[in-house]
């Protein structure tokens, strides 16, 4: 029977460390600032942004929300980003995705100053991650590595399989595992004999977007299973990409949904914002 990795508890511990450091900086009149740009009225995005704001303020950081209508021009949005790039009170900039179809996400990400790119999506930060240089790492992959390490497992020398190859989770988490000296396979919808490939993993990260996709025949006994999914099952109940009840019998450690990877994402955003501020102040 697998042990549950408590993402809520770990996220709280990391947030407490960030909050303590922010309080120390306040004593020398320094305050990290995070700006979030929200375009349109997507309810899921709005809820997520509200959570980010609340957690930013709880950590003692400056929190700025800029709301723009769905019809805003790409040019206007890029102007807003450029203004934030030159604002000395803002150290992290995040444009909430997805954006309306008439706006190029790529152009927006490229416009964010890479030293304020706390989402870790700018090509410079992506490149630095892939050559093993210190960079801003996308928040979910960064959180996943912390979750794996919290089990006391040494990643070096382990066999890791990542199911999913998105630029936001799959590819960066695979690279982070490689940087930790794991032997990494990236699997996806075209991978042949997927259960057999997955079953070789000491560490299995699942980011398919398919509810309860991974069953126990995918699991090597004792493996660490990280479920990145946020889906709904046939009863409209929140679930992950892993069939938790089926897999927990085989896994050594497993993240639940909710309460696993999710809470870590915003916490790592705060850690990235603190890191950005310290870099800009040349305090690293």
Curated annotation (Swiss-Prot):
Its EC number is 1.5.1.5, 3.5.4.9. GO terms for cellular component: cytosol. One of its GO terms (biological process) is L-histidine biosynthetic process. Pfam families: THF_DHG_CYH (PF00763), THF_DHG_CYH_C (PF02882). NADP(+) binds at residues 164-166, 189. The keyword Hydrolase applies. It catalyses: (6R)-5,10-methylene-5,6,7,8-tetrahydrofolate + NADP(+) = (6R)-5,10-methenyltetrahydrofolate + NADPH; (6R)-5,10-methenyltetrahydrofolate + H2O = (6R)-10-formyltetrahydrofolate + H(+). GO terms for molecular function: methenyltetrahydrofolate cyclohydrolase activity; methylenetetrahydrofolate dehydrogenase (NADP+) activity. Keywords: Amino-acid biosynthesis, Histidine biosynthesis, Hydrolase, Methionine biosynthesis, Multifunctional enzyme, NADP, One-carbon metabolism, Oxidoreductase, Purine biosynthesis. Pathway: One-carbon metabolism; tetrahydrofolate interconversion. PROSITE patterns: THF_DHG_CYH_1 (PS00766), THF_DHG_CYH_2 (PS00767). InterPro entries: Aminoacid_DH-like_N_sf, NAD(P)-bd_dom_sf, THF_DH/CycHdrlase, THF_DH/CycHdrlase_cat_dom, THF_DH/CycHdrlase_CS, THF_DH/CycHdrlase_NAD-bd_dom. Disulfide bonds: none annotated. The keyword Amino-acid biosynthesis applies. Homodimer. Belongs to the tetrahydrofolate dehydrogenase/cyclohydrolase family. Catalyzes the oxidation of 5,10-methylenetetrahydrofolate to 5,10-methenyltetrahydrofolate and then the hydrolysis of 5,10-methenyltetrahydrofolate to 10-formyltetrahydrofolate. This is Bifunctional protein FolD. It comes from Listeria welshimeri serovar 6b (strain ATCC 35897 / DSM 20650 / CCUG 15529 / CIP 8149 / NCTC 11857 / SLCC 5334 / V8). The gene is folD.
């Amino acid at each position: 029977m697998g042990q549950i990795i408590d993402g809520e508890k770990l996220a709280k511990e990391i947030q407490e460390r960030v909050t303590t450091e922010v309080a120390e900086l306040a004593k020398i009149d320094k305050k990290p600032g995070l700006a979030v740009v929200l375009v349109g009225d997507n309810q899921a995005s709005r809820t997520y942004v509200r959570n980010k704001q609340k957690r930013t303020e709880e950590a003692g950081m400056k929190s700025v929300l800029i709301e723009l209508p769905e019809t805003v021009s790409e040019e206007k949005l890029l102007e807003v980003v450029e203004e934030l790039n030159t604002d000395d009170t803002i150290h992290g900039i995040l444009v909430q995705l997805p954006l309306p179809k008439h706006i190029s996400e790529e152009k927006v990400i490229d416009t964010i100053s890479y030293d304020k790119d706390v989402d870790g999506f700018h090509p410079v930060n992506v490149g630095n991650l892939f050559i093993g240089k210190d960079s801003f790492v996308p928040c979910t992959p960064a959180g996943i590595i912390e979750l794996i390490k919290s089990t006391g497992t040494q990643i070096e020398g382990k066999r890791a399989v990542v199911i999913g190859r998105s630029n936001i989770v799959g590819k960066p988490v695979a690279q982070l595992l490689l940087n930790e000296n794991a032997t990494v396979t990236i699997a996806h919808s075209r991978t042949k004999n997927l259960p057999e490939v997955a079953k070789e993993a000491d560490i299995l990260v699942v980011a398919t977007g398919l509810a309860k996709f991974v069953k126990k025949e995918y699991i090597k006994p004792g493996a660490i299973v990280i479920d990145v999914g946020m889906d709904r099952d046939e009863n409209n109940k929140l679930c992950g990409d892993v069939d938790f009840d089926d897999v927990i019998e085989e896994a050594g450690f497993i993240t639940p949904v909710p309460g696993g990877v999710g809470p870590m994402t915003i916490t790592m955003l705060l850690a990235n914002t603190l890191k950005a501020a310290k870099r800009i102040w040349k305090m690293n």
